[in-house]
């Protein structure tokens, strides 16, 4: 494919990741002001204010594959932008915690669907040699959105007085509207047109405009993969025994992604840093360092993913997780101070960006056959969001300075996450296959042959 057109389509679609990332951590700046405004209890605050968007992502991820298969990738990407926009305006203008939670839920549905459809779309238009980097653009935009949200929260703190949190949340409407308009400029996935619409003429037209050297050969390869899907997997579905290994791989990578504690740290970064001894505004500023580190090392992950491969990056990340989380736990346990703690929080973020952060959406999007890719992506994404929601829900019960179980010394939380990363390291060594540099159709044959 012509690099310029391929990259342009990928960048547009990956902007959904920017909104995903921004929305993920913007709540960290609004967390304390909302708690003080509506006098929420730790349990209510955890369920309605902090994790309601994540329950929306679970719903969106779980069922997002259905419209993605029926309506096509492009239409669903467009609706994702509409959901983002409605959520941004709704949360900024909400006058009670229930209405606020409703609009956070709407935005979460959009994020959940985007985590299904965006990686699928990019993986289907990419070539085998560029697929890792291009799908990882989605992850890059997630971390770029995270950084921009931290900067925005810091810049808007105090702006509008007690209503600064409304500006923090409402500013998301700008990229949401821009993304929605840009989606009109992309083409539909040729693989979807062939496998679901049998529209070979339109698919060939798109492949030709994108610069595919041998259009007929590309179409034949897609048709061959589609034929294999039908002949080998007529009882299509994730419960088919042929797919057990694929389902297990998607489950485990999503499970370990959240059991690293990444969303816990991103959602509660200012509060964690305050407990380490930083003032509120200093904690918001240091959150920017977390976002910046995430962005820089995501570049490293993007550079390495198609060179070293997915499995190697997961191994590197696992070792970094274990070291950093163990030392963060020690920092809280021994009261070493904010500088020591911050250093190893940044090491944790770097390990995540190079490892799980760079790999998860690429890996899930490429391991499933074309005809169940939407369902597989939905499954993996929903597992990711279920555990993200559960962790975010229970965090105030453990972390709250006044009523939390650990109050101002949450070292056992980080020790638990470190232990989970030891298990991830063992799993990667023993179970994870390498997928770099292989066409989706060849990868399907490789993984299913091992399963059988």
Task: For the regions a language model picked out, list residue spans one by one.
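Short, well-structured alpha-helical segments
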Residues: 215-227
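Conserved H-loop
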Residues: 213-216, 279
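Alpha-helical transmembrane bundle of multi-pass membrane proteins
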Residues: 1-201, 205-208, 227-452
């Amino acid at each position: 494919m012509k690099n310029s057109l391929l990259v342009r389509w990928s960048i547009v679609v990956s902007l959904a990741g920017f909104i995903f990332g921004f929305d993920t951590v913007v709540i960290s700046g609004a967390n304390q002001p909302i708690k003080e405004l509506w006098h929420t209890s730790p349990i209510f605050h955890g369920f309605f204010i902090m994790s309601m968007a994540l329950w929306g992502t679970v719903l969106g991820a779980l069922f997002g594959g259905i419209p993605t298969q029926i309506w096509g990738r492009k239409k669903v990407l467009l609706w994702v932008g509409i959901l983002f926009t409605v959520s941004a305006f709704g949360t900024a203008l909400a006058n009670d915690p229930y209405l606020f939670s409703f609009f956070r839920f709407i935005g979460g549905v959009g994020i959940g669907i985007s985590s299904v459809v965006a990686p699928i779309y990019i993986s289907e238009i990419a070539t085998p040699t560029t697929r890792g980097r291009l799908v990882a653009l989605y992850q890059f935009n997630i971390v770029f959105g995270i950084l921009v949200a931290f900067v925005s929260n810091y810049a808007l703190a105090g702006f509008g007085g007690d209503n600064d949190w409304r500006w923090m949340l409402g500013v998301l409407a700008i990229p949401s509207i821009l993304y929605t308009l840009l989606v009109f400029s992309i083409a539909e996935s040729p693989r979807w047109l062939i496998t679901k619409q049998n529209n070979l003429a339109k698919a060939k037209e798109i492949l030709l405009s994108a610069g595919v050297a041998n259009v007929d050969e590309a179409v034949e390869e897609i048709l061959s993969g589609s034929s294999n899907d039908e002949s080998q997997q007529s009882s299509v579905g994730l419960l088919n025994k042929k797919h057990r290994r694929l389902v297990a791989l998607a489950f485990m990578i999503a499970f370990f992604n959240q059991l690293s504690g990444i969303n816990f740290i991103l959602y509660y970064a200012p509060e964690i840093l305050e407990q380490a001894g930083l003032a509120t505004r200093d904690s918001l500023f240091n959150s920017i360092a977390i976002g910046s580190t995430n962005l820089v090392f995501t570049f490293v992950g993007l550079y390495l993913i198609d060179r070293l491969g997915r499995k190697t990056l997961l191994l590197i990340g696992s070792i970094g997780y274990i070291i950093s989380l163990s030392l963060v736990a020690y920092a809280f346990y021994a009261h070493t101070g904010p500088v020591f703690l911050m250093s190893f929080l940044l090491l944790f973020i770097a390990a995540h960006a190079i490892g799980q952060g760079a790999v998860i959406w690429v890996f899930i999007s490429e391991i499933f056959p074309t005809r169940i890719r939407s369902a597989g992506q939905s499954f993996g994404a929903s597992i990711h969001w279920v555990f993200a929601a559960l962790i975010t829900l229970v965090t105030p019960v453990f972390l709250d300075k006044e009523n939390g179980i650990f109050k101002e010394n949450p070292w056992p939380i980080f020790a638990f996450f470190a232990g989970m990363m030891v298990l991830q390291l063992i799993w990667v060594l023993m179970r994870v296959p390498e997928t770099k540099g292989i066409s989706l159709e060849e990868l399907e044959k490789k993984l299913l042959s091992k399963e059988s």
